[in-house]
């Protein structure tokens, strides 16, 4: 996958918190792609090839399964039977997501959260090269310099105000979304290149920055309070916003 997986999965000690049943351990031992004669080579984003590391895949799936009524081993098994020599890391991510999504049913609804977490992991890796998002100020500076965010964000707010707003953000709320919700965010709202599929942000930045734009002209003494209240309502879906607002506000098109 990537060198950052250990750092990423350690963000909240996810793996250590996950309990593994004896049956799941047995299933894992039966997966024998690590046998030298069965070695699969993966193609990384930089074009380099290296042997597949099943332990990294195992850790990511078990991390995403935390506190969910799902079988991580079933998702692993369903993923690995689709791996082939030369598969890219992006295809591995997508295969894992599909393996989880294919198990969603009325009898096993928690797979919608597992698939969503794996998709969020994938989107963040595409956007940032790692699981952990950058600070709000770093994100805005980079996106403004690339012409993807409205440059007035940097003139309307000071670096200290961005630091304060950064404290409002709870990126872990991404992990509470359903698969359908994340797919909608990916398809309609995230700033991205729709030609090559590059993604440049993750969901919590949308909710915070829409509020920051909407209240940017309010009195400085009170506007951050409005931004925080807006963010908390929008990011927990207590507030529904039209597509032009969600997709356009914070970008040079503005749409408000």
Protein language model annotation of sequence segments:
Residues 2-256:
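Extended catalytic cores of very large enzyme megasubunits
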């Amino acid at each position: 996958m990537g060198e950052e997986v250990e750092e990423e999965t350690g963000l909240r000690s996810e793996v250590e918190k996950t309990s593994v049943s004896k049956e799941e351990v047995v299933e894992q031992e039966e997966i024998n792609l690590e046998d030298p004669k069965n070695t699969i080579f993966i193609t990384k984003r930089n074009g380099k090839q290296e042997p597949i590391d099943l332990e990294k895949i195992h850790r990511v799936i078990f991390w995403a399964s935390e506190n969910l009524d799902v079988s991580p081993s079933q998702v692993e098994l369903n993923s690995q039977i689709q791996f082939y020599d030369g598969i890219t890391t992006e295809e591995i991510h997508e295969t894992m997501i599909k393996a989880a999504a294919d198990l969603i049913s009325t009898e096993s609804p928690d797979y919608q959260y597992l698939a969503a977490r794996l998709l969020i992991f994938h989107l963040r890796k595409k956007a940032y090269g790692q699981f952990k998002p950058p600070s709000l100020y770093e994100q805005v500076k980079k996106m403004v310099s690339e012409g993807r965010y409205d440059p007035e964000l940097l003139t309307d707010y000071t670096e200290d105000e961005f630091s304060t707003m950064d404290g409002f953000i709870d990126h872990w709320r991404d992990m509470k979304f359903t698969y359908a919700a994340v797919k909608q965010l990916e398809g309609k709202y995230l700033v991205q290149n729709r030609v090559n599929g590059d993604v440049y942000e993750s969901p919590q930045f949308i909710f915070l920055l829409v509020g920051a734009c909407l209240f940017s002209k309010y009195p400085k003494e009170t506007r951050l309070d409005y931004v925080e209240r807006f963010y908390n309502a929008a990011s927990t879906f207590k507030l529904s916003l039209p597509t032009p607002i969600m997709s356009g506000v914070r970008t040079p098109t503005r749409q408000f």
